[in-house]
């Protein structure tokens, strides 16, 4: 620890960081934890036992040893044991964490605070994923601040915050299955401040149910209500990108600190020891970057549908031939569990047709890939991490949202920010081909690239300049984490 004596060390602030146990939530929480560590906090990072095992498998047995001042701990997720190397079922996971995780989390805090056996400073704050809000009662018992990190976009969170009103207005649950396709979802909602022109179909998709007892709706109502009890709310976005939405959210929630894009903030952390701490649950394939090194600038479409999206083999084949027929270079990440219930088979004809210009891999280091000069566009599911990383890199998008608030992100990318084109959910190869060509060599693609670079520039200013909004919000957040909560 360098020059810190043990008595000085025990006075360090100690943040316990606990992400929701899915890839897209672990990544941003680890970035935030590294930033806090860099700012002088001792960190305890809490994974579930299931994901801890997956990380050891993907990153090697030494990968979670951590540092003296950055430790990894685990709690059970309450689900039956499984060795499957795939994303867990989201509704089951939400129900299980809500029901089973509070007791082991409290026991962990107790152990960390046990002066007879613990060699770490007492826990002084909790930074929890907003959908792990059971942690609030543990923080209240210890009388320490609890900050909730909503990992979606601000526009996605604003959608969730209006679920109660959607129910009150009879807009969800849907009356019957015909409402999925009869135009009902196309109605414009003019009563959500900060979301002008938003349609029902653009809001997070859990409302698209005919089941009056839909668990995910109950879960969202519970989590959005509990968010009001936090000391503060953190978002991985920036004021300039979502100003109207953030202003609207500020009337509904405790103080909000947009501190994104986190990856640009984290790039300023000059600490080699932290760089070895990674969070990819699948093994990264370094040959992706080697292959990109052989390609011209802005000549490759990066294709990745994230860690949760699944598709049918027919959809996979339509995407494949759309990419092949576009004659553009592509790097396509196909997770082992991307095709629901079966393995993906693309066939020799496709491989032969694209061997000079296509590379398929099972996972990669996305930030390095998307920042590579060869990448000219991104075919994405519009998960928020992918979207904000694309914005930070100045890369325009083709959007194929799958679920949750990905629809909302797609709407804002295409209609508000000018950096995306949506592809029909019922994907056809001709549309894939024409959109990929437009993205890479068309006029609209050029306009979107220009706009994406403008957003990249704003994102860099807001995170790197002392008067930038995200830079100063991080400083304000640290003050909250070091303060005593006001009840």
Curated annotation (Swiss-Prot):
Expressed in roots. It catalyses: 7-deoxyloganetin + UDP-alpha-D-glucose = 7-deoxyloganin + UDP + H(+). The active site is at 25 (proton acceptor), 129 (charge relay). GO terms for biological process: (-)-secologanin biosynthetic process. Gene3D superfamilies: Glycogen Phosphorylase B. InterPro entries: UDP_glucos_trans (IPR002213). The keyword Transferase applies. Pfam families: UDPGT. Its EC number is 2.4.1.324. This is 7-deoxyloganetin glucosyltransferase. It comes from Catharanthus roseus (Madagascar periwinkle).
